[in-house]
Amino acid sequence: MKWRVNTTPDAFTHSTVDPCRFGALNSEVIFSSLELDVGSCLVDAGCGPGEYSVLAARLIGETGSVIALDRDPWMIEQLRQTIAAQAITNIHCQVADLGAPLPLRDQQADAVMISAVLHMPGLTDRWQILFSELQRGLRKGGKLAIIEKSNASAPADHPLHLRLSPETIAANVTPHGFEQCGLVELRADKFLILFEKY
């Protein structure tokens, strides 16, 4: 079953409480789509400095865990500093190439999120590896949320040739044991496409 939610302006904020990469999108919309709860295990693939990882760690509590992966050592170091400064104990971060085998156990995660990553040069030709690895690391029934900028418009800060349509993403994800189960318009130029592992 497919569903679509059009969020209101209240669905995102520009405060430091929710400092997300896409102009501070509301993490509640994203995390509720992933069905995160106390005790969940989330993989934040392409975590950057870890804005979502930190917010998720608070939500899932000490019995849950966040596995934060990024190919950039500097980003991982920023997240490690945040973890230390805030005494967070349930985030495990690691430098990892998303286009190569991932440091995940089979069916380890309840949910995976990928925000503003798929369009990056160097990864676009290795999606098949990434989606196969995420399928391996995600439990049956687990959710995969992909957040990208829409290709419907092209502001100067994000060239059109780097934009992805939900249809393009779905065509590449579904052959790897996933079914599309949602499409959320986060803003006019940003969307979340949701999949479930079957």
Spans of model-derived segments:
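Conserved Class I S-adenosyl-L-methionine
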Residues: 157-176, 180
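A short acidic, Gly/Pro-enriched loop at the edge of an enzyme's catalytic core
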Residues: 99-112
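A short glycine-rich, Lys/Arg-flanked "PGG" loop and its adjoining helix->strand segment in the class I
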Residues: 128-140
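Class I SAM-dependent methyltransferase SAM/SAH-binding core
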Residues: 43, 49-100
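Conserved beta-strand signature within the Rossmann-like core of class I S-adenosyl-L-methionine
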Residues: 141-148
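Core SAM-dependent methyltransferase catalytic element
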Residues: 182-198
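Conserved alpha-helix/loop element of class I SAM-dependent methyltransferases that forms part
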Residues: 21-40
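Class I SAM-dependent methyltransferase Rossmann-like catalytic core
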Residues: 6-25
